[in-house]
Amino acid sequence: MKPCETVSQLSTVAINGWDLQKALRLLHSSNPTLFEWNNSPIVYKTTPEWAEISSIIGHFFQKKAGLYHYLSTAKKNYREYLKGDMVKLKKYFYVLRPILACRWILEKQTPPPMLFSTLAEACLDEALVPAVTDL
């Protein structure tokens, strides 16, 4: 029987993780979620081994895989969240963030940052920054 590749625990705090074998397989295929986890500004626990992997992870980033992932996410979220009459404000960000991530990848050729504010400052047209910030 194949061991579980994903660690999940639901309680007051949501804990998620992958075993090393799965993480390395996802890294090899340039899975954007792994890059997001690596770029997260919030780290509760790490290890020296992960610090080593983290230092080279950017070399495995494939622009095409990242663009496909974020564009697909934006399209899916648009169809799912923005087609109704009443749209919750935060749902716009579910479409805007992956679009900005695509722009980041095209301009910088690196995985996009996790923080929306960093993406917005770097990728939004200057005239749009105040409007999005006000949201």
Predicted regions and their residues:
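Conserved catalytic core of two-metal-ion nucleotidyltransferases
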Residues: 2-82, 89-92
